[in-house]
């Protein structure tokens, strides 16, 4: 209660005084900085650490899976004093300070305390509140100061600004209990009870955006062109339900400085990008979609990170998160840096981040980007540009161990949330069980099918017979992994043309007939499905992240009918369990005819354990109408339930309007057969009835 004057003991700004007491006592400082009002503050160094020895030891060992609960900026009350506890891992730093809008960005004011030999720095700053801007000022061993964003920040400034923002993400009231409770069934991966999964891949900033308004001086008057997460949730959920998709997969929403990176060069792994709102807004987005029965999968990038000065690169003046040797630490394709997975604290950072999105945001799956680049030390590199492993091979043993560790812990803590790998090579057992030497993913993108099938579809129909094997080859290896058939964003950029644009044909009608046949084959082929936004209505211009999809195309008959077709095809998929239930069980698929090379046609069955569910699928990849006898599995009546050549979808209307009764005539090695009309450039489905 009686102020005691303090004397400046050092020109760096240290003050001290003598107080004649033998026991600890509570005290505050009365401080006056130049040109500022007098302040009364608590001593930041009088508060106990929030870390236990166990916390730090587990982080040091790479197994503190909830490290995000303490690392970063945490609003809290300690000993009755409100403030924010800051902490950061920077073992090679000479000094670390918290700077922000609460201390004039002055690194002398709040220098952090080093916690033992763990490389963690910490300080509790009284009076700092939610919404404050901050960074870490790191003084390197060379004496150079650097300003770094918080790797564990829950919220970040909108680009081009790069400060972290103190956030409390504990207050959102979730109401998706019913979805979370039933998610194990909704997303079942059981071999005999595989759930339907039809994913709509999208980029939040260009699926739909606002029209920019300008005043008479040409100045923008309506601010951001982006909709808020909450606004997008309402618009997107209506569209997804209308179009009969089951999930959305969102291109990375973690904070990133460069729009043109599409989110794949992340600087804020724990921050949903502020382009579309706050963390609470993003929680609302996921919660709302869950309540509408829509799953949410996030793209996640554990393979590399950008060189931006405010990010992870050379974080404490050393190569902390990346390898020091550029042959190990530099990514040649993207100009980015590769994580040093052998460092426990680095793998802990990434593992806890994946768990964070499942825990705090209720995400239904993580799709890991560029897994192939993680698995191979020589990925994208020439001889002499990479370092072999201890056995002389090109396998990245540290990355393999990291993936197994991550997948093991993730599935243990979130058994009903999915792990999906974008892996483009023939690496074995990507979706194999960890106990059997697999990597432990639930699903793997089928890049082989995508490449082969698109090359086949790009051919003039009259030349497709020469590449017929590309149509059927995927079934030779389909059951080696749990594959998702993907037609993703990567296939509609960089001069590749959109999916509609890839199709052959002198007219739009011919192109769209090809596209309908392609989608029909995809949706009846075993495996889960993914389609990139805009392709469902046949957008002709390549995707551009800076503009909205061309929704105005739906004013044209050919595009509106294409959208109507996609909607109906997705409904077919959902309505018939034979199209998904045994996706990864060989009993769920059977060829009837895969040798009609000259006609470029295939006939196959999709099945469940119940004979009554059996579907006969016929695909014709030529513009020729065939009168065809096909073998069928059972005696009975077969009704055409779907035809991509229907006039309502823009087709010519050739089909089988009446049910067909089988005859006892051996065709395609079957005792029973049907005589049908095969529409041109089309997929048709028949349902069996006794």
What are these regions (language model features)?
Residues 202, 373-374, 423, 474:
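The feature represents the membrane-entry module of six-transmembrane cation channels
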Residues 113, 258-263, 307-314, 431-432, ...:
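Short glycine-biased active-site loop of nucleotidyltransferases that positions the nucleotide triphosphate
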Residues 159, 362-364, 379-546, 553, ...:
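Conserved alpha/beta catalytic core and glycan-binding cleft of carbohydrate-active enzymes
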Residues 91-93, 101-103, 139-141, 253-255, ...:
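An acidic- and aromatic-residue-enriched active-site/binding cleft used to recognize and process polar
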Residues 95, 143, 206-209, 491-495, ...:
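Short, acidic Gly/Pro/Ser/Thr-rich loop/turn segments
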Residues 153, 157-158, 171-172, 177-197, ...:
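Substrate-binding/active-site clefts of carbohydrate-active enzymes
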Residues 1-195, 220, 230-240, 244, ...:
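Carbohydrate-interacting/catalytic domains
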């Amino acid at each position: 209660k009686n102020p005691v004057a303090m004397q400046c003991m050092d020109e760096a700004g240290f003050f001290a005084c003598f107080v004649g007491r033998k026991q600890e006592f509570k005290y505050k400082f009365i401080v006056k900085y130049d040109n500022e009002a007098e302040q009364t503050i608590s001593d930041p160094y009088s508060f106990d650490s929030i870390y236990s020895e166990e916390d730090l030891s587990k982080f040091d060992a790479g197994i503190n899976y909830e490290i995000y609960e303490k690392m970063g900026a945490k609003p809290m009350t300690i000993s009755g004093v409100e403030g924010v506890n800051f902490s950061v891992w920077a073992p090679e730093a000479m000094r670390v300070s918290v700077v922000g809008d609460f201390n004039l960005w002055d690194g002398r004011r709040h220098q952090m305390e080093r916690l033992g030999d763990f490389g963690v720095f910490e300080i509790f700053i009284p009076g700092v509140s939610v919404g404050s801007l901050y960074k870490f000022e790191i003084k390197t061993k060379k004496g150079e100061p650097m300003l770094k964003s918080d790797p564990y920040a829950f919220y970040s400034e909108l680009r081009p600004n790069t400060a972290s923002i103190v956030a409390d993400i504990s207050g959102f009231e979730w109401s998706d209990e019913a979805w979370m409770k039933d998610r194990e069934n909704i997303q079942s991966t059981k071999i005999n009870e595989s759930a339907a999964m039809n994913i709509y891949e999208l980029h939040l900033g260009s699926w739909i955006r606002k029209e920019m308004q300008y005043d008479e001086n040409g100045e923008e008057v309506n601010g951001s062109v982006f909709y808020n997460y909450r606004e997008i949730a309402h618009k997107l959920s209506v569209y997804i339900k209308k179009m009969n998709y089951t999930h959305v997969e969102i291109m990375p929403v973690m904070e990133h400085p460069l729009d043109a990176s599409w989110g794949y060069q992340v600087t804020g792994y724990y921050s949903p990008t502020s382009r579309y709102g706050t963390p609470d807004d993003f929680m609302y987005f996921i919660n709302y979609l869950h309540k509408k029965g829509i799953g949410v999968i996030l793209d996640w990038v554990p393979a590399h990170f950008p060189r931006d000065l405010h990010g992870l690169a050379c974080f404490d003046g050393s190569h902390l998160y990346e390898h020091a040797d550029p042959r190990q630490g530099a990514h040649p394709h993207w100009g980015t840096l590769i994580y040093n997975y052998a460092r426990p604290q680095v793998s802990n950072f990434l593992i806890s981040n994946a768990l964070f999105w499942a825990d705090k945001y209720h995400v239904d799956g993580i799709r890991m980007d560029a897994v192939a680049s993680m698995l191979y030390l020589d990925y994208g590199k020439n001889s002499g540009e990479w370092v072999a492993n201890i056995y002389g091979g090109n396998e990245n043993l540290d990355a393999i161990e990291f993936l197994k560790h991550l997948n093991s812990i993730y599935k243990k803590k979130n058994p009903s949330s999915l792990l999906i790998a974008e892996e483009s090579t023939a690496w074995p057992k990507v979706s194999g069980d960890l106990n059997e030497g697999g990597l432990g993913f639930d699903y793997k993108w089928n890049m082989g099918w995508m490449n082969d099938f698109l090359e086949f579809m790009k051919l003039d129909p009259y030349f497709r017979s020469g590449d017929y094997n590309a149509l059927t080859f995927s079934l030779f290896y389909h059951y080696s992994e749990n594959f998702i058939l993907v037609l993703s964003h990567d296939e509609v950029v960089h001069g590749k043309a959109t999916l509609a644009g890839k199709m052959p044909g002198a007219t739009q009608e011919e192109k769209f007939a090809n596209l309908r046949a392609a989608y029909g084959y995809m949706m009846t082929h075993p495996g889960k499905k993914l389609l990139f936004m805009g392709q469902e209505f046949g957008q002709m211009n390549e995707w551009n992240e800076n503009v909205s999809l061309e929704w105005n195309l739906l004013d044209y008959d050919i595009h509106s009918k294409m959208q109507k077709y996609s909607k109906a095809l997705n409904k077919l998929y959902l309505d018939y369990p034979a199209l998904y239930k045994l996706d990864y069980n060989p009993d769920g698929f059977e060829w009837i005819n895969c040798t009609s090379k000259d006609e470029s046609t295939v006939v196959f069955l999709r099945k469940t354990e119940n004979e009554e569910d059996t579907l006969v699928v016929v695909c014709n990849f030529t513009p020729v109408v065939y009168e065809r006898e096909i073998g069928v599995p059972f005696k009975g009546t077969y009704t055409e339930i779907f035809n991509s050549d229907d006039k309502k979808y823009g087709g010519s209307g050739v089909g089988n309007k009446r049910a067909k009764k089988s005859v006892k005539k051996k065709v395609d090695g079957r005792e029973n057969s049907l005589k049908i009309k095969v529409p041109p450039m089309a997929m048709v489905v028949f349902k069996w009835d006794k």
